[in-house]
A protein has these predicted regions:
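Bacterial N-terminal signal peptides that target proteins for export
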Residues: 3-17
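Sec-dependent N-terminal signal peptides
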Residues: 16-24
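Core segments of small alpha/beta cavity-forming domains
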Residues: 32-88, 92, 189-268, 276
């Protein structure tokens, strides 16, 4: 082989090597990154298998949707359990990934999502559960319901399909969904998934309101009552103070010092009231029922009886002595209250009892008459 032929062979060898390198480079770069559609499909499969990030996103959106409906905030110690429930619920949405198209330097992928109708699947269970609710603690009550609700997820139907356009961008050798697309996707995976929480929270919110009414009336603890009624604590405090300076006090024509003695004695007597609200249930007609254990505070009743007996016997020679005798009697029972036998009162509250009006208020008044009979 002459020199010219040798140079030709070298050139052919170099071209061959270069071609091989180009083929290998093309194989490594062109086949190493999956198609945008495949990435979206894998992402959706991961969501169906239970994805922590999506469960957190769903939970936060759910908490925001119920924020302000109830006085109690969503409990921190319930979040982990609710995320697990959401991960299982995500196994029941369906999808179809369609075509992808380039969009600027990113991609758009069309996807049809049929959400899992969680609310429908657990609706009957929710209703039955709150009719027999035994717990008075929000986290415990919801956790029990979630365990039952997970069994119902197998009956979950799918809602109407919705076509979404998801935007994805390149990230290293793969892709990632944009934040907006993640949020849009989260909004369409499940429906009614906060229903178990709301079913329980609604009932316990009514119970909590009843507790706040009693505590504000008898104990002077007004902060929770103010939150339930939308008033300020100052307004609630003023209402409490006025309850001890009504027509009865004005009719007695007391001095400033005597008024103070009367109000202090009455506040102590009221504060000594004993009541305990049991579990609350929701009735089939949409009302609420609970059992309240009451140990009647007989102090006012005994004070009136003692005053009447003393007056009838001629113990008081003047109106001033009568007033002083009454104040002294109240102060005695304020320091040493007298109680009757404990009893259980069944209390029925109508729908909308959160405003405590009409029949609902009559029920509460009946309860109050047994807590502190006059």
């Amino acid at each position: 082989m002459n020199k010219k032929e040798d140079q030709t062979c070298v050139r052919i060898w170099k071209i061959g090597v270069l071609s091989l390198l180009l083929v290998l480079l093309f194989a490594l770069t062109g086949c190493g990154k999956e198609a945008p559609e495949d990435y979206v499909k894998e992402r959706l499969e991961k969501l169906q298998a239970g994805d922590d990030e999506m469960a957190e996103m769903l939970l936060q959106a759910g908490i925001e949707s119920v924020d302000g409906k109830y006085v109690a905030a969503f409990p921190e110690n319930l979040k982990n359990r609710y995320r697990e429930f959401l991960k299982k619920a995500c196994g029941h949405f369906t999808y179809t990934v369609k075509e992808a198209e380039a969009y600027n330097s990113d991609y758009r992928v069309k996807v049809e999502i049929a959400p899992a109708k969680v609310g429908d699947a657990v609706e009957a269970l929710d209703a039955e559960y709150v009719q027999t609710l035994e717990s008075t603690e929000l986290t415990e009550a919801v956790e029990i319901l979630l365990s039952k609700a997970e069994e119902q997820l197998e009956t979950c139907d799918n809602g109407r399909k919705k076509e979404l356009t998801l935007e994805i961008r390149e990230k290293g050798s793969s892709y990632e969904l944009t934040k907006d697309s993640q949020k849009e996707l989260a909004e369409h995976l499940l429906s009614g998934y906060m229903d178990p929480y709301q079913a329980v929270a609604e009932v316990l919110d009514i119970r909590d309101y009843l507790q706040s009414v009693l505590d504000a009336t008898y104990k002077g603890e007004v902060s929770k009552y103010a939150r339930h009624t939308g008033s300020t604590e100052e307004q609630a405090r003023e209402k409490y103070e006025k309850s001890f300076s009504g027509e009865e006090l004005a009719a007695m024509d007391l001095s400033t010092e005597q008024e103070k003695r009367f109000q202090e004695a009455m506040k102590k007597i009221f504060a000594g009231s004993r009541y305990e609200i049991g579990a609350m249930q929701k009735t089939a007609d949409g009302g609420y029922v609970t059992q309240v254990t009451v140990t009647p505070n007989l102090s006012l009743q005994k004070s009136s009886q003692e005053l009447h007996t003393n007056a009838k016997s001629g113990k008081y020679g003047s109106e001033a002595q009568l007033v002083e005798g009454y104040l002294t009697t109240l102060e005695t029972y304020a320091q040493q209250p007298v109680y009757g036998e404990a009893t259980t009162v069944e209390l029925h509250l109508s729908t909308g009892a959160i405003l405590m009006s009409g029949d609902a208020m009559q029920e509460v008044n009946r309860l109050m008459e047994q807590i502190l009979p006059s």
